[in-house]
């Protein structure tokens, strides 16, 4: 992989367009978690230190493309930046696509990229407009690196210089460290509701990790190979595929589970073995024996890859499995990497972000990188380097 890095370029007094990932949860104009903003700051701060003219763009949520929707405006991010960079002039508008004049060390935040018609289908005219704003394009949104859109991919065809920001490089380096030459033993914890969405990830990780621990609806599909699991969430169409994986690799499934009769917040949990689950019961978390076994595996590991909760952690009585796994990873001296939307929510819930070696900002991009897919944004950076170096 040959790409330019922002750290290698002279960006002083240059117009720098940074594609950040500022897709944070916002309710009633209040930012609920600033994790992605904090991850984006080092690249922005470096550009300011180098006296670049800094333009920032990002998407937020899923508005109807081409239309302004207040709920999805980046205005709360603008307010956040004003406090963070209180000695810096910061501009915010939806009209910057026609050009903006900045002095070195100033910032312009563009409005939500998805308010621009053509963003999602990688429109060439829009991509060209983005490229006209800058001398150098910095791709720093790992969380959107798997999307072939104008602001993440199309711009690379027109801009003279495209490079990777600090966050994108750190994401790639951390994933390579876990996947290429992991310290052993390596354990991968894969939770979530569907085997179908993570089958390729499981298949790839099974060939790399010494042990795979499955949780959530994914584990239920593996349990359904041998047991009747009541009304638990699982995928009947993937039971055969799950069996092929289990028979070939070291995949750990729960030996006991917390079950309930109703999927609701205050439902009482009963611990049962998989051969004792009734028709009107559903699995919603690991049981104590499973937790004990899994803690032992994690404690002995030197590399830990974690994607997804192992139970319905939003319900207090079905939180223990996810909580104990999260805290065991946090207390481990192993190299740990965590990624995926719900995983970040768990990390926030138990306040362990400073105890994980690397927390990926990517969801889909995180999974596709693990699968071995070439992410469109990285492909764009490679092509830009190759074509503009001739």
From Swiss-Prot:
Positions of ATP binding: 198, 314, 340-343
Record's keyword terms, sorted: ATP-binding, Cytoplasm, Glycolysis, Kinase, Nucleotide-binding, Transferase
Cellular localization per UniProt: Cytoplasm
The keyword ATP-binding appears for this protein: yes
Top EC category: transferase
Molecular function in Gene Ontology: ADP binding; ATP binding; phosphoglycerate kinase activity
Keyword Disulfide bond: no
Enzyme Commission number(s) of this protein: 2.7.2.3
Reaction(s) catalysed (UniProt annotation): (2R)-3-phosphoglycerate + ATP = (2R)-3-phospho-glyceroyl phosphate + ADP
Subunit structure: Monomer.
Name of the protein described by the UniProt record: Phosphoglycerate kinase
Encoding gene per record: pgk
């Amino acid at each position: 992989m040959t790409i330019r890095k922002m750290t290698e370029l002279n960006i002083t007094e240059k117009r720098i367009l940074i594609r950040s990932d500022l897709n944070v949860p916002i309710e009633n104009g209040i930012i609920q978690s600033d994790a992605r903003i904090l991850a984006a700051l080092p690249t922005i701060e470096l550009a300011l230190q180098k006296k670049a003219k800094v333009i920032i763009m990002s998407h937020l949520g899923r508005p109807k493309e081409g239309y302004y929707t207040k709920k999805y405006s980046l205005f709360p991010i603008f307010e956040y930046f004003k406090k963070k960079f209180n000695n810096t002039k910061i501009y915010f508008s939806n009209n910057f696509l026609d050009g903006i004049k900045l002095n070195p060390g100033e910032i312009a935040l563009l409005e939500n990229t998805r308010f621009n018609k053509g963003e999602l289908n990688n429109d060439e005219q829009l991509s060209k407009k983005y490229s006209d704003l800058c001398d150098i394009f910095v791709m720093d949104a790992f969380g959107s690196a798997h999307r072939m859109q104008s602001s993440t991919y199309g711009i690379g065809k027109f801009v003279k210089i495209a490079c990777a920001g600090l966050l994108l490089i750190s994401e790639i380096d951390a994933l390579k460290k876990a996947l290429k030459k992991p310290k052993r033993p390596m354990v991968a914890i894969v939770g979530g509701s569907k085997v179908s969405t993570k089958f390729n990830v499981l298949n790839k990780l099974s060939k790399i990790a010494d042990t795979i621990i499955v949780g959530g609806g994914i584990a239920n599909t593996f349990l359904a190979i041998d047991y009747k699991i009541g009304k638990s969430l699982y995928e009947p169409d993937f039971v055969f595929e799950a069996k092929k994986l289990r028979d070939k690799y070291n995949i750990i499934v729960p030996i006991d589970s917390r079950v309930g009769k109703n999927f609701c917040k205050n439902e009482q949990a009963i611990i049962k073995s998989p051969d004792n689950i009734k028709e009107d019961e559903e699995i919603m978390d690991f049981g104590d024996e499973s937790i004990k076994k899994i803690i032992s595996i994690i404690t002995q590991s030197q590399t830990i890859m974690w994607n997804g909760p192992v139970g319905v952690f939003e319900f207090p009585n079905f939180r223990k499995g996810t909580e104990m796994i999260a805290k065991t990873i946090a207390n481990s001296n192993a190299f740990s990497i965590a990624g995926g939307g719900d995983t970040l929510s768990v990390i926030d819930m138990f306040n362990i972000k400073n105890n994980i070696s690397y927390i990926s900002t990517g969801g889909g991009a995180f999974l596709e990188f693990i699968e071995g897919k070439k992410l469109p944004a990285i492909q764009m950076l490679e092509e830009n380097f190759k074509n503009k170096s001739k």
